[in-house]
């Protein structure tokens, strides 16, 4: 009964158009002060202890690094490198977009940032080269979702905060699925380009490829700094985030010189605004998690599933359906922070690896970012292409269907996610 009251109140507040963070906070406070005897002091204590986690500090640093790289011309150099490598294949610029999104995802940690950085440069070039606007929009909107699967990933950090799972293990677990999804999206792009005979670029010489690689190498080295540093134990994921922010600043301002010193305060302010917004969501989500635990809702869900003989396969299918439905109305950070505290205890009780479950949630978030009505990538791509959301929804379907198929593979083949972190001794 209490669960129905909590989720009913949350749904009503969200339907009024109230921001997710405020809806969460009001739901918790209303329930606590009217239907429980929980002391106010314990609520305040939980509020502060819940956000004292060291991992949370990684979020603003990864956001800052992504903003420096987005404004610093790194994306343009990555696109040139990607085009030199695959531009001569069918759908060359489209394949270059997939590859560039994968590379930029490995340094930004954000899907919308990836779509903006790559799409704003590549989409006009694709249209100019003779590609249909729909094709380019479909490629970039879906490939941009790689930003939260290929590490570093802000959504993975939030999952770690919500479930106390190792950030480093999550990052390593995202590498192979991220590359596999990039290959899948590239395959769809190549097939459609060949089917409709879309244009190909002239084949670049190895000299041109080497020149493009040298121009982009400073941005690509950030991948080595973050992932190499975490794996070798030189620094923790949070320290890696701080290092990536400093490196991205040096790269954008002093090496590439695409960002002037006078532009740095604007980047810092934008990063601070986004970080504050996410921290506010986390704060209210911590309270929501507290009330879930206090009312034993995850435990009751686990007991119900076990009592009805529902096993791992049925539970994971239910999770996918629930998370995909939530993706229709909420953005990834909110979904992870609301649903992870509810579903995670059940997953652990059923023997599902916490790292594998985290990757499943992240892939669900990727799909959610590419379908209406609240798919963030669709709105970002719409702003770049000037296409309507309905038209854009039709454009992304071939890639979106392949992502749904990939979701099933990730869900029921744990080795795809767990092989690398197990080999590295991280789990």
Whereabouts are the PLM-identified features?
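Alpha-helical transmembrane segments of multi-pass membrane transport proteins
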Residues: 1-427
């Amino acid at each position: 009964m209490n669960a129905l009251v909590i989720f009913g109140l949350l749904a009503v507040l969200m339907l009024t158009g109230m921001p997710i963070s405020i809806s969460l906070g009001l739901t918790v406070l209303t329930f606590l002060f009217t239907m429980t005897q929980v002391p106010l002091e314990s609520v305040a204590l939980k509020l502060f202890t819940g956000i004292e986690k060291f991992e949370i500090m990684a979020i603003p640093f990864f956001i800052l690094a992504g903003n420096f790289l987005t404004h610093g011309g790194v994306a343009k150099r990555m696109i040139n490198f990607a085009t030199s490598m695959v531009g001569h294949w069918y759908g060359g610029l489209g394949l270059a977009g997939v590859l560039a999104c994968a590379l930029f995802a490995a340094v930004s940690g954000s899907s919308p940032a990836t779509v903006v950085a790559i799409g704003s440069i590549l989409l006009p070039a694709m249209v100019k080269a003779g590609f249909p606007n729909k094709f380019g929009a479909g490629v970039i909107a879906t490939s941009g979702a790689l930003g939260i699967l290929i590490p570093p990933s802000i959504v993975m950090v939030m999952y770690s905060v919500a479930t106390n799972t190792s950030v480093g293990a999550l990052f390593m677990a995202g590498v192979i699925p991220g590359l596999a999804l990039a290959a899948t999206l590239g395959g769809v792009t190549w097939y459609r380009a060949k089917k409709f005979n879309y244009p190909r670029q002239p084949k670049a010489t190895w000299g041109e490829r080497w020149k493009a690689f040298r121009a982009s190498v400073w941005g690509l080295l950030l991948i080595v700094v973050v992932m190499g540093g975490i794996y070798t134990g030189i620094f923790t994921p949070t320290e890696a985030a701080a290092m990536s922010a400093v490196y991205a600043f040096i790269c954008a301002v002093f090496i590439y010189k695409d960002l002037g010193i006078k532009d740095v305060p604007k980047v810092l302010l934008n990063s601070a605004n986004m970080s504050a917004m996410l921290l506010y969501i986390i704060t209210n989500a911590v309270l929501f998690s507290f009330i879930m635990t206090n009312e034993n809702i995850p435990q009751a869900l686990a007991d119900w599933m076990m009592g009805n003989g529902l096993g791992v396969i049925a539970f994971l299918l239910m999770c996918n359906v629930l998370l995909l439905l939530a993706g229709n109305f909420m953005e990834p950070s909110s979904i992870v922070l609301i649903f992870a505290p509810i579903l995670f205890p059940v997953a652990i009780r059923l023997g599902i690896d916490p790292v594998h479950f985290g990757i499943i949630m992240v892939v669900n978030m990727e799909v959610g970012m590419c379908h209406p009505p609240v798919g963030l990538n669709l709105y970002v791509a719409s702003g770049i292409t000037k296409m309507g959301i309905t038209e854009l929804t039709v454009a992304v379907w071939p890639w979106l269907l392949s992502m749904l198929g990939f979701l099933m593979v990730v869900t029921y083949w744990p080795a795809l996610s767990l092989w690398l972190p197990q080999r590295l001794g991280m789990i």
